[in-house]
Every structure is written in structure tokens, then in C-alpha cells.
Amino acid sequence: VATSNQLADAMSDSGGAAFRLGRPFPGRDDGPCEPHISLFMMAVDATEVAEVAAAVAGAARTVTPVAASAVEYRHNHEGAPEVFFARSDEFRAVQRAVIAAAEPLRRGRIRELDPGGNPLAAVLDDPNPKDPARVRQLRTYGFDDVSDDQDDRFNPHVTLTWPVDETSRVDLTPLCPAADFSGRLTDVALYGMAPNGTCTRRYGSWTLTGDPV
């Protein structure tokens, strides 16, 4: 949260920040923007949340905690500063367990927008996509950052804030070492999403309790 505030303050001269971790998304009152690593995103109705929660809880019982090693900061293509973690089989196992349990409940539905606010229908309708692997994963999972047998697109990261002016790039050199974010991922959670991929409305969290392989 401190790093999010540091970056958001630094964006004040270039349009400001869309959100700060630990605070509600501006204009919403459904909870603070929680620091998180996105494992999966899906579209469901409010009446189906309990079913999804039960699926995620079941997945958590099948996999072990993850040693999360933060390795670098960098901007995403929309200028949002993010801290990235080393890809690992432990991370992949957790993501695959969650998707195996929850994705069938998607029932083919596609989210309206990606975290940057871009319509996903346009990505799927493009006859000449720039990123065919992304399109394939969106059609298969409704999510395009998946580690599967064809493409390893899962790149664990935390989005620290998001610039209002997406052409700007805040300086990342004053930040604490990325390694300071390293730790142990012991729980998965289910959240409702706000703009820019933020997690605001909390539905539950579950400890990873599976036996080591």
C-alpha cells in the first residue's frame, strides 16, 4: 500500500492515479482496492457467487502455499506500474486448480471489458488478431493470462496503481527493491472487480491446504 501511494503521488504531475491500493475505488463504496495476484477472472451473475466460492474453496484444499519471489517492476502496456513474481510450478498449480474448479461455472460467458477498459468482444471478433494465443485463451477460459499446455501466459504480478494518463510512465527507480515484496502465498480469495482489474468486494478467502507433491 505504501508503494502504491508513493507511485500515485508521483503521478500527480501527469494526470493523477485512477486508484490507490488500500482505498476504495473513486466513486465506489464496495470496499478498498486490495493488493492481489490475479489467478482467474470470469463473468457470473450475483446469484452464482456462492457456487463459485464453493468451487474456489474446494480448489484451495488441493494445492499447497506458494513461495512468491518478486523479481522486478515494470509498466504494463497501459502505463500501470506492476511488481512481477518469478514464474513457478507452484504458481501454475494454484492457477490450474482454480480454473479447473471455477471455469465450468462461466458457462461460456465473456467479461465485457479487460482491466484497461477495452471491450473483449472486439478482441474476439478481430479476423486478424495480433495475438492469436490471447484469442484462443479468451475463447477457452474467458481469461487470457493462463498457463496451459499450449501457451504459458500466466505472469504473476501485482498492479500497484494505474495512471489516468495512460501515455505517461511514472519513474520506478525510487521504489524499494522489488524483492521486498517476496513472501509466501498462503490463501486464495474471491472478489468482485472494479475498473482497472481492482478487487474491491470481498466474498471470501481460503487457505491452501493441499499435500505437497
What feature does the model see in each segment?
Residues E82-R87:
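Short histidine-centered catalytic/ligand-binding loop motif
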Residues V1-S69, Y73-N76, S88-D187, P195-V213:
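Basic, often amphipathic N-terminal segments
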